[in-house]
Every structure is written in structure tokens, then in C-alpha cells.
């Protein structure tokens, strides 16, 4: 987990390194933790959940680590303004790193979630498609004027079938973006 960034009052973001594949999920706001990422093995693969994670750090990460950028095909133009996308992601599949790529449009047209195996079960990286509120409720990432309500509802129905053990969002309200999911 990288240092927090606060793009809006009350909203916090992090990026997360999955060391099993040296895969970075989301994007850090600064290069302040590049040394720590290097100490953990670096970044070989960089996964974005949607266009809002694209920014100046994409070039910095690629330059520092030689990483492969994987990002939603539906938002390729927006993301490519910051750095070229090496692997456009448009369909549900398990990639060569063991990451299940799950397109979940609705928050944005290209919103994508990722399901990975981990030490404590299955980890679902949801981007901003689903986040936890400070009072413990789940919030669907619907934003007037940007999101598609019906498409997001379909994506949420899909996510409900996955049964992850841990959910990790890119943005969050409250203390943490990492939440263990209790069975039932």
C-alpha cells in the first residue's frame, strides 16, 4: 500500500503492490515510494481500473521499472494522453499473471476490476466501482453526469457472484480501502 493521496476532501486513494507477480494496482500520486517498491521487487505489471488513475506517474513508473501498463480498452484514448497502454483490456479473462480481468463498466465506461489469489484468499480490486463508507456500508461508484446507472447495476450483479475474501478499492472514505468480506 502506497502513501495516501487526498484528491478531494474526505476521499483517500492508495496504490497496492501484489508481490506474487510484482503487479501494481491503481496508481500512486507521487514517486515518493519508488525505492520501497524497488525493495519489494519492483513493478513488472501495472493495472489501472479506469481513466481517473491515469496521470504523470504512469510515465515515471514505466521509466523506473520498465513495467507493462494494462488498462481498459474503452478508455484507451484518455489513458494514452499520459502514457501508452501496452495491454488493452476489453474482455473477461485470466491473464498470464494469474489476474482475473473483469470489465465492470458503469462508474466509467471502462471500469475494470481484478481478482487475484492471495495468502488470505481471493482479493478483489474494485477501483471506484464499489467502495466502503465510514459507517461500513458499501457504496456503488455512481456519479451524476459521468456514470451509467443501468450498466453499473449489471456490473454490481456480476461482482456479487464472485465471493472474494478481501475487497480493495482505489478510493475510499474513512480509514481504509481494504475490507475482509464475511461469508453470508
Label each residue range with its predicted role.
Residues 1-8, 22-25, 30, 67, ...:
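Metallo-beta-lactamase
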Residues 20-21, 96:
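Residue-level signal for tight coil/turn positions that link beta-strands
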Amino acid at each position: 500500500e502506497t502513501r495516501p493521496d487526498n484528491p478531494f476532501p474526505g476521499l483517500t486513494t492508495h496504490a497496492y503492490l501484489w508481490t506474487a507477480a510484482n503487479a501494481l494496482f491503481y496508481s500512486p500520486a507521487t514517486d515518493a515510494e519508488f525505492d520501497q517498491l524497488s525493495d519489494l521487487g519492483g513493478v513488472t505489471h501495472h493495472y489501472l481500473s479506469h481513466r481517473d488513475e491515469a496521470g504523470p506517474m504512469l510515465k515515471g513508473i514505466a521509466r523506473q521499472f520498465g513495467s507493462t501498463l494494462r488498462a481498459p480498452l474503452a478508455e484507451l484514448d484518455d489513458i494514452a494522453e499520459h502514457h501508452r497502454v501496452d495491454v488493452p483490456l476489453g474482455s473477461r479473462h485470466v491473464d498470464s499473471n494469474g489476474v482475473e480481468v473483469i470489465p465492470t463498466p458503469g462508474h466509467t465506461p471502462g471500469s475494470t476490476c481484478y481478482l487475484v489469489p492471495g495468502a488470505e484468499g481471493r482479493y478483489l480490486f474494485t477501483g471506484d466501482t464499489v467502495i466502503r463508507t465510514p459507517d461500513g456500508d458499501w457504496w456503488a461508484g455512481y456519479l451524476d453526469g459521468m456514470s451509467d446507472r443501468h450498466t453499473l447495476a449489471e456490473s454490481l450483479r456480476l461482482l456479487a457472484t464472485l465471493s472474494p475474501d478481501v475487497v480493495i478499492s482505489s478510493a475510499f472514505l474513512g480509514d481504509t480501502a481494504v475490507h475482509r468480506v464475511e461469508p453470508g
